[in-house]
Amino acid sequence: MNPSLVGSEMCIRDRLQPALYISKLANGISQSNGNKFSIYEHSPAIEIKKNNDSWEIKTPTGSVITKKIIMAVNGHAESFGFFEKRLMHVFTYASMTKKLTKDQLTKLGGEKKWGVTPSNPMGSTVRKITGINGDRIVIRNRWTFDPSMEVSERRVSKFGNDQDKSFNDRFPMLSDVEMEYRWAGRLCLSLNSVPAFGEVDKNIFSACCQNGIGTAKGTLAGIGAVDLATNTDSAIVNDMKSYDAPKKLPPKPISYLGANAIIKWRELKAGKEL
């Protein structure tokens, strides 16, 4: 980590990997394709139901009927009855600071925005972001395995204390900075590290379970699902179809205790990177 870039002297090596946010990508595609398709937000699919030779996708306030479905919902594939007892639902946790003042930004120094990922996957990911809501720092660490796909506010708050410590270790000059937001986000893994890909029912194509590498593997799975749905022969489809199916997990009590014990052990091995 370059001190002149991020304002912290905790690490000495870094790798920068800029990326576009998916929302900007979707907006750009929508604007450049006129009325060829529509994007619906705040309309979660809560049920998929067979409707003659089509599928009906129900939302809280309406429904969509379609011939084909590309299902890119990661772990929530299990919520629709697919890959049952074969997907591991893992949460990671994050905190975001309040808007940094001019004085705090001066103390921090470094570039206007940056992102740092750890060499150990259990370590802390740290980002400095800037936008209409000001300059802020986001820190993400800690992991849990939760088959219910839900975590409590208490859990988020508890791990928030760990993020406060990680933040203070990296930025002692910002001891007066407070966190404004805390949250948990889902990851989906499989026991044998393979995707949940393919035609899972007639004309339902899954591009799920990215095993923690959503930007790369999710993009490939999405392209592959489109190729599969349009009967396009491609190297991506052939590669994705070459994987075994996700392995069945042990019974819940065993998988829950075992997975969380392994996570805890790996977090301990992360040392100062956490």
Describe each PLM feature range:
Residues M1-G7, C11-I12:
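Single conserved hydrophobic/aromatic residue that forms the stacking wall/gate
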Residues R15-L20, A26:
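Domain-scale recognition of functional cores that engage charged ligands
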Residues I29-F37, D201-N203:
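A short helix-to-beta-strand connector/capping loop
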